[in-house]
């Protein structure tokens, strides 16, 4: 169903995770007899697409609908199955929908599948609303980590960092721990665990306790994953705020990639001609219309199963335009090669076999050229260049202890608040906090222009650690030098260092992982990252020597074990960016490292979505 998840030579087969999630859903549906429709909370539409295809429901005669106030259900349907996030705020809408449906069709049965777990608060709210008796089954789908790509899984919880740091809701930490146990159930016990940060430590403590409860499932079974690195988002708040300069990162920042899908106005793309044959590797338009879709929009799938995108995604944007131009020339040469010296049989073979592939490659190149063109307009805008210059000055600690003239100009011009706050937070992080006088100066300026309500947002930023008073440690300034977070002579095309993802800044999280790969790396690293917030921890799980992982792709002899890359699971608690992911993929591509990464995150974020989650009420 999702062949791109298996990968080529990957030791961790994420198809197993997808199949387990799909199987769990079907088992729940099969327990419900009679005709049925599935009504989805809007935040569950994307996750559902990650584990199954619409055809699977069509084959079973099940319709998919989005939960909206104006939704009317078919009268003949006997069962309505709601698939929802366990959010109390949704229960009022759900109760109203059930009451309206009950009046329209007597005898109809309702069911709820909460993902990733059942909520007692939600059930209590349904009871208060007087509709609890209408529900036959109230179950849960243990969808913790969902596979986005061959090396990437996500909990799809965009507010996880805010929930924990601002609201004090630690349920996402528990779910991350449950997800780690689930991964070990599928792929075997992870023997070595390293981590940094308070929330990361709490995730591991939960996972360890849950693992003890499930000891019989994988006791002593050394799995395919050799090492786990847990990183708390709060140890590096600069990277999620920084402008990403990889192709994938820029797409996400300007247009948003949601569950591997990019949706843009169809007018931006060349019309789709009929392609001979069925082969090719171009970006595939999703077969089914999105439940929230717009017929004037075009949706393109972006994952490693699309060959051209896999080649472009982690490149610096300056390299992408050159690669696309070269690819277009190559296709043109192949398609217009002279046929004078070819036999009829050779021409027939070309038309039947090679031509469909070339047409698909041409379509993919054309579409990505259109996307790159849209990005080029954004990147060449004056505001983009000015903002980038300002944040890069902060990254090298230039004039970080006094008010920024650029930020003050933005405030005076009353630009959008997010844009101003992002730069203020970046300056604060680079300075390891503001002196009280400087922090109060910015607060006064913001209140004067944006009103008193801005203080509520500032309070959230202070609770989350994005704004705070200066500490004596000067952690960022020290780490910038000891871990080489900024590289002056960085190369963007065919780079030699991970700093290319931000042109000259290496994400701290990725640099920590890079150093941990070295012999005695974590032991050496501990003293360097000691000034970062939260504990530095390590743990080891008992294993039986010589027992292979239960889901390795290939079986290797003892003599060849040294040539097999070690598998490192890097888990971001609080979200990570595509730039950080690109940096880890760059490290995995270096032969000297002999490593394969599996990346887990609560959500893939960018500078806009990360800050927005903290600003919402």
UniProtKB/Swiss-Prot annotation:
Q: What is the lineage of its organism?
A: Eukaryota, Metazoa, Ecdysozoa, Arthropoda, Hexapoda
Q: Where in the cell is it found?
A: Early endosome; Late endosome membrane; Lysosome membrane
What does UniProt give as GO cellular component? CORVET complex; cytosol; early endosome; HOPS complex; late endosome membrane; lysosomal membrane; lysosome; membrane
Q: Give the function comment from the record.
A: Core component of the class C core vacuole/endosome tethering (CORVET) and the homotypic fusion and vacuole protein sorting (HOPS) tethering complexes involved in endo-lysosomal vesicle trafficking and lysosome biogenesis. The CORVET complex facilitates docking and fusion of endosomal vesicles during endosome maturation, acts upstream of HOPS, but is not involved in autophagic flux. The CORVET complex may cooperate with the early endosomal tether Rbsn-5 to mediate endosomal fusion.
Q: Tell me how this protein assembles.
A: Component of the class C core vacuole/endosome tethering (CORVET) complex composed of at least Vps8, dor/Vps18, car/Vps33A and Vps16A; unlike in other species, Vps11 is not part of the Drosophila complex. Due to the reduced number of components the Drosophila CORVET complex is often referred to as the miniCORVET complex. Interacts with ema. Component of the homotypic fusion and vacuole protein sorting (HOPS) complex, composed of Vps16A, car/Vps33A, dor/Vps18, Vps39, Vps11 and lt/Vps41.
The organism encoding this protein is Drosophila melanogaster
Q: What topology does it adopt in the membrane? A: Peripheral membrane protein
Which keywords appear in this protein's UniProt record, sorted alphabetically? Autophagy, Endosome, Lysosome, Membrane, Protein transport, Transport
Name the Gene Ontology molecular function terms of this record. Answer: SNARE binding; syntaxin binding
Q: Where is this region: Disordered?
A: 268-287
This one is known as Vacuolar protein sorting-associated protein 33A
């Amino acid at each position: 169903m999702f062949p791109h998840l298996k990968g080529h030579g990957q030791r961790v087969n994420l198809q197993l995770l997808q199949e387990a999630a799909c199987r769990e859903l079907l088992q729940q549906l099969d327990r419900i007899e009679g005709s049925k429709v599935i009504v989805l909370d809007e935040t569950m539409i994307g996750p559902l697409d990650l584990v199954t295809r619409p055809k699977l429901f069509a084959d079973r005669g099940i319709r998919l609908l989005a939960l909206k106030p104006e939704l009317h259900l078919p009268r003949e349907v006997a069962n309505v199955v709601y698939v929802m996030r366990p959010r109390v705020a949704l229960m009022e809408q759900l109760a109203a929908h059930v009451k309206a449906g009950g009046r329209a069709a007597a005898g109809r049965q309702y069911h709820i599948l909460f993902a990733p777990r059942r909520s007692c608060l939600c059930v209590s709210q349904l009871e208060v609303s007087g509709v609890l008796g209408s529900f036959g089954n109230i179950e849960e789908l243990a969808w913790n980590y969902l596979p986005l790509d061959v090396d990437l899984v996500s909990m799809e919880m965009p507010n996880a960092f805010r929930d924990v740091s601002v609201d004090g809701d630690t349920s996402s930490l528990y779910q991350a721990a449950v997800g780690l146990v689930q991964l070990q159930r599928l792929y075997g016990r992870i023997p070595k665990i390293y981590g940094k940060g308070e929330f990361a430590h709490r995730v591991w403590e939960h996972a360890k306790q849950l693992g003890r409860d499930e000891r019989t499932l994988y006791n002593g079974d050394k799995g395919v994953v050799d090492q786990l690195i847990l990183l708390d988002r709060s140890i590096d708040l600069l990277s999620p705020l920084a402008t990403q300069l990889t192709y994938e990162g820029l797409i996400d920042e300007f247009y948003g990639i949601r569950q591997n899908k990019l949706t843009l106005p169809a007018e931006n793309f060349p019309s789709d001609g009929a392609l001979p044959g069925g082969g090719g590797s171009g970006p595939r338009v999703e077969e089914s219309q999105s439940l929230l879709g717009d017929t004037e929009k075009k949706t393109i799938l972006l994952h490693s199963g699309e060959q051209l995108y896999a080649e472009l995604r982690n490149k610096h944007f300056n390299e992408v335009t050159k690669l696309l131009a070269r690819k277009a020339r190559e296709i043109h040469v192949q398609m217009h090669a002279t046929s004078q010296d070819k036999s009829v049989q050779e021409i027939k073979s070309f038309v039947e076999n090679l031509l469909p592939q070339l047409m698909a490659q041409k379509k993919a190149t054309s579409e990505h050229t259109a996307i790159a063109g849209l990005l080029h307009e954004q990147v060449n805008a004056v505001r983009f260049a000015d903002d980038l210059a300002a944040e890069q000055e902060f990254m090298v600690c230039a004039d970080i202890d006094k008010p920024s003239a650029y930020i003050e100009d933005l405030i005076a011009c009353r630009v959008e608040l997010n844009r101003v706050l992002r730069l203020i937070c970046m300056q604060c992080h680079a300075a390891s906090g503001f002196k009280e006088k400087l922090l109060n100066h910015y607060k006064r300026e913001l209140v004067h222009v944006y009103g008193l309500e801005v203080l509520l947002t500032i309070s959230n930023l202070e609770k989350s650690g994005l704004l705070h008073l200066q500490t004596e440690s000067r952690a960022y300034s020290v780490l910038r030098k000891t871990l080489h977070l900024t590289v002056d002579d960085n190369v963007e095309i065919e780079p030699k260092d991970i700093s290319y993802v931000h042109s000259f800044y290496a994400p701290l999280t990725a640099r920590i992982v890079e150093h941990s790969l070295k012999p005695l790396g974590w032991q050496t690293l501990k003293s360097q990252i000691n000034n970062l917030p939260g504990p530095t921890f390590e743990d080891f799980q008992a294993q039986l020597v010589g027992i292979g992982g239960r889901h390795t792709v290939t079986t290797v002899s003892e003599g060849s074990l040294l040539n097999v890359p070690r598998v490192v699971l890097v888990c971001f608690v609080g979200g990570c960016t595509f730039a950080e992911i690109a940096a880890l993929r760059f490290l995995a591509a270096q032969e000297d490292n002999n490593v394969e990464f599996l990346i887990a995150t609560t959500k893939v974020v960018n500078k806009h979505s990360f800050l927005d989650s903290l600003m919402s009420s």
